[in-house]
């Protein structure tokens, strides 16, 4: 008995202090678990929503994830610390607190009072020795991390949580969970509407002008291009600093009047910058990492800019009607309306139904800017025997009656679908006239931002798209990744094959018709050209004729001898006022519709077309040009 008595006392275990685990290892462990879980859900989200599968999607999602984690973690820690001891004891999750032996629990529970008993600690089967420690503020914070991770699971799939049966929890927990779910759904709606997001640097142009030298302040920002839910339009938002939850600047894309890359003289020290100009006069300069990002941002913003159908219809109707009518009336051209009854040159039946007579009167000239000519008709004219594309903008109007010997080298300005230095806004208005029913209507114009390059503007389901064209010295055309021997080959290809769109999606767009170009108003010059006419059809005005092309079309010479006599008579009659002037070409091959103003081409046009004009237009020509149509 004496030997057995002290046995149990000697065998009683002495409590050994548990070493405190490394907090860095703990943070890394839970961060890895959260990252792996979020990565799987992120990949699943991209598979379900391929619209967000962009190269920088991972960075954007992770930044948003980290920012929300910090906010929620701080709020949860403050809530737990403010709550009473009982609430704190109930908030401890099962994974953070490990089951203890009865005697160990009693030893550890004594210093903290009776508000925390052994029954409050959950009994979990899997025991982790590294987190077996007493209750402390650090332990509570680590337990909150597990609670936040559970909340992430609910945030990743809010729909099942919203539809699930209510769990047994305190009213405060239910209220906070409902609040978190509502904020999650609102954030998800905004995330769905994001078009593009990236980190850039920007400054206001006024600050750049006010600063001396390079003292202008560049600010880091997170640029977000998204669709506004209410108006169904896009907005551009600047988040300063990049982690800010609300934008510092929010610009609707309908208020942006210009988006372009900067010229070397504008930003000599910065290569990868572009400019945003807003209607209220504000101007923002943004800097990207490389040239690729710069051009892609400009293309995305320009692609999302939607001018709006109602405004374009208003402008086009004004241009077609009252606005141009006032200009015609100011020219005092009362006799011009009689030119409608004059005989006209024979027209080909292929295009005669589509294109009206060239320059019969002022309103016809205005209407020509909105004439839509089928591209197939233009291509058939080129393929016809003797046909060529040199017929300026009369391709298909006078058939294939061309003189090969007098045909000079062709330029883009010789074709009816080329509109010269037409602005981006005006080009969009031309192709969008009529809305989606004019799907495939196009024009080709010079680039506003890149001299020497051209832009194909076309109607894509009621929206204007702009595709850049590059021409080398041999006339070869480069469109995206495709090369063509000429612009005509490019038109033939895209007439039968869909155009590859950079935005992706169903590219069911082919070129169907084009907007026929209009004569630009003549520019004032030192020596005005005189229209070739008979002795009875002459003009002694020293100014440029706004309707001189109309007069030339209405008064063609009946024969080469008449043309020579008309030229000499016109020169002698106008010498008293302004001296001799070179004759203006008659409407025909390489006529004034070509936007080349060199005198050599004008002389070639007269020599090539003097013998081709029909004599039927001679009887009424004196009346058509008797008035002065000078436009001052």
UniProtKB/Swiss-Prot annotation:
The modification Phosphotyrosine is found at residues 52, 629. Keywords: Cell membrane, Cytoplasm, Membrane, Phosphoprotein, SH2 domain. Disulfide bonds: none annotated. The keyword Phosphoprotein applies. GO terms for molecular function: SH2 domain binding; signaling adaptor activity; transmembrane receptor protein tyrosine kinase adaptor activity. Tyrosine phosphorylated by JAK2, KIT and other kinases activated by B-cell receptor in response to stimulation with cytokines, IL3, IL5, PDGF, IGF1, IGF2, CSF2/GM-CSF and cross-linking of the B-cell receptor complex. GO terms for cellular component: actin filament; cytoplasm; cytosol; plasma membrane; ruffle; stress fiber. The modification Phosphoserine is found at residues 141, 310. Expressed in spleen, prostate, testis, uterus, small intestine and skeletal muscle. Among hematopoietic cell lines, expressed exclusively in B-cells. Not expressed in most tumor cell lines. GO terms for biological process: actin cytoskeleton organization; antigen receptor-mediated signaling pathway; B cell receptor signaling pathway; B-1 B cell homeostasis; brown fat cell differentiation; cytokine-mediated signaling pathway; insulin receptor signaling pathway; intracellular signal transduction. Residues 417-515 form the SH2 domain. Residues 193-306 form the PH domain. Residues 558-579, 604-626 have a biased composition (Low complexity). SUPFAM superfamilies: PH domain-like (SSF50729), Phenylalanine zipper (SSF109805), SH2 domain (SSF55550). Residues 400-409 have a biased composition (Acidic residues). The keyword Lyase does not apply. It is found in: Cytoplasm; Cell membrane. PANTHER family: SH2B ADAPTER PROTEIN (PTHR10872), SH2B ADAPTER PROTEIN 2 (PTHR10872:SF4). Adapter protein for several members of the tyrosine kinase receptor family. Involved in multiple signaling pathways. May be involved in coupling from immunoreceptor to Ras signaling. Acts as a negative regulator of cytokine signaling in collaboration with CBL. Binds to EPOR and suppresses EPO-induced STAT5 activation, possibly through a masking effect on STAT5 docking sites in EPOR. Suppresses PDGF-induced mitogenesis. May induce cytoskeletal reorganization via interaction with VAV3. This is SH2B adapter protein 2. The gene is SH2B2.
